[in-house]
Amino acid sequence: EKDSNFSVLSDSWTKEACDRNYQYNFDWLGRPIIQFPGDIVAIQELIWSVKPDLIIETGIAHGGSLILSASMMTLLDIDSGKYEPQKRKVVGIDIDIREHNRRAIEVHPMFYMIDMIEGSSIEPSVIEQVIQIASEHRSVMVFLDSMHTHDHVFSELNAYAPLVSKDSYCVVFDTVVEKFPKRYYPDRPWDIG
């Protein structure tokens, strides 16, 4: 194949970067965002292209991804140099929102656009809350980035993929785990498969 050497190099670089916790070195507007810069740019491109009025994110951690989504949606509301706020929203779901992270997100200038739900993203009551919120929006995008086990991601896909609008996206993060050696993350419940 034409790009097989590049693919091998990319996979090798990604593993070496993860060995060094490279993804923990970045912030978005002051909040840590546990992502590779290339993924951040790709998300920005998807949001700008689709122009959603609701982004649903599973997994909050430090809140950097929520802030990225909210800031991009704020930019979508600038029309001809004037800020014309729409009813855009970012909903973040996490089973454990650490208090110091919650406080930091709540005092961030982008918080006005963010709702956080504490609970498992696959819990029926959480799913129902999100379905209700989604019913009030016309263009929905979904980012799945919480528990990376096969069963959990499959359950999230069943719950949230049907909410994705036509011509929008459901993005599953960290599928790179499939390219790493078995038990690469010994302190995590996910692995290859």
Predicted features by range, described:
Residues 29-31, 38-193:
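S-adenosylmethionine/decaboxylated-SAM
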